[in-house]
Amino acid sequence: MRLCILIPDDADLTRYADWREQAAQIDPLLKRRGIMPSYRPWTDDPPSDTDLVMPLMAWGYHRNTARWYAQLDHWSRLAFANPLVALRWNTDKRYLLDCAAKGVPIIPTQFHAAIAAADLDAARVAFKTETVVVKPPVSAGSDDTWLLKSPQTLPVAALGRAMLVQPMMPSILTDGELSLFYLGGTLAHAIVKRPTGGDFRVQPQFGGQSESIIPPPAAVAVAEQALAAVPGEVLYARVDLVGDGCSGFVVMELELIEPWLHLNRAADDGAAFADAIASACL
């Protein structure tokens, strides 16, 4: 069985050098099950000798969205671990609004095709908060993401661009952000990520820390609602949740393209991941 895993393109290999760290985790798991992984930049032509494709480390695609969509078309003759319809849907964070329309609890979210200064004031009124987060609908790693507390205004770099506006959820600072990992349709493991040093971002590059948890049933229920809203069945997913301040949870993000899987946090050391891939390659 042959598995092609997409990685950063040559221009981004230095920026995202840690793709090798995740590759080192998954290689032995896959090879023990007779799966031969190969790694290919997401900007390359499709291979002729693979059974399954995973864009698991296609980091950097968000900075060239047109090329990303074109590559999905270019590779469309191949089988993907998560179907192309799900990858396209998940590329743009307006999928949150689609989830909400299907009854999934999400973080309150506004979309502005060309954001203006007045939109920020209106969002603060609508969300009943002084502090909001502004981010592009296609983004990763908190690129071009701003935390703006009244009376702060939109940065020049954001004006006139397509942007999402969301309230800053206080529970991120107190309780952290939950990430639930689903492999082969089953909850495999979960972590809580917490910001440190006064930052609001939970990613490791900003000092965020994480630990394994057993997620509360209410969080699992919301995560599975979100997955049910996805177009097509997916082999792997990460669902990010945050407390809503009323003993419930809302979806912050649903990552179906290139999540860091945190297999080192899994009680089975990643066996569920490898088993899911093996089943898909049959």
Predicted regions and their residues:
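Glycine-rich phosphate/pyrophosphate-binding beta-alpha loops
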Residues: 59, 142, 196-197, 255-265
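Phosphate-binding site of ATP-dependent enzymes
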Residues: 141-231, 242, 250
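Conserved N-proximal alpha/beta basic substrate-recognition cap immediately N-terminal to
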Residues: 2, 9-113
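Anionic group-transfer/hydrolysis microenvironments
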Residues: 58, 137, 168-169, 181, ...
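ATP-dependent carboxylate activation and anion-phosphoryl transfer catalytic cores
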Residues: 217-282
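Active-site nucleotide/adenylate-binding loops and adjacent lid/helix of ATP-dependent enzymes
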Residues: 1-7, 72-78, 84-175, 217-221
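Residue-level preference for long, well-ordered alpha-helices that form the structural scaffold
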Residues: 15, 19-22, 64, 212-215, ...
